[in-house]
Amino acid sequence: MKIVTGSTAANLPACVATIGCFDGVHRGHQYLIEQVHNIAKAGGLASCLITFTSHPRQVLDTDYRPRLLTCLSQKIECFEHSPIEYCVLLPFTKELSLLSAREFMRILHEMYNVQTLFVGYDHHFGHNQGEGFEEYCQYGKELGMRMMQSRALVEDGTSISSTLIRSCLLAGDIKKANAYLGYSYYLSGRVVDGKKVGRTLGFPTANIQPLCAEKLLPATGVYAV
């Protein structure tokens, strides 16, 4: 997978792309990514994933403190295990947030060579996110860009989402969170001194201070690793 930034966008081949925050890169995201890969392969196009270098809400609300399932480096690591060929890292700015959906689509088409844009079932973009898939399809016809939409990945009657996984982690249900993620939730950090609880449990424990301050911590407890 090749990482693409603003300076290298001009070198992108014609592609099928999807766009989003992809927090957690969970099974719902993996399902979407697999479809992008298959559509691109069938059409003889490259496959591309476009994501943001920071959470959009952080830019629009400076007081907002996200609780992320994956920081940017972890997301990229997950993407590298997918069949996607290109990953565009797009800085989210206030100027970008003011673009209409049509103008944003024009930029994707002209700057990033997006020929087909494949979006999630609940994905919205453009200023105030006031438009939906029908409007995107109309703009796509005007711009010469095909629009496609994925269905939700449903398990036990529930759509797999980042919000659902956060709820599981905050409730301490790591098993269910991992099932929705498709891999084991993990933290990267350094070991710090704690309350020496391990001495009373009969087995060693370690207190981890996450390297990513925005990383979501599961419910308080002692977890096996």
Give the positions of each predicted feature.
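N-terminal catalytic cores of NTP/NDP-binding nucleotidyl/phosphoryl-transfer enzymes
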Residues: 9-71
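Glycine-rich, highly charged phosphate/nucleotide-binding loops
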Residues: 66-75, 97-105
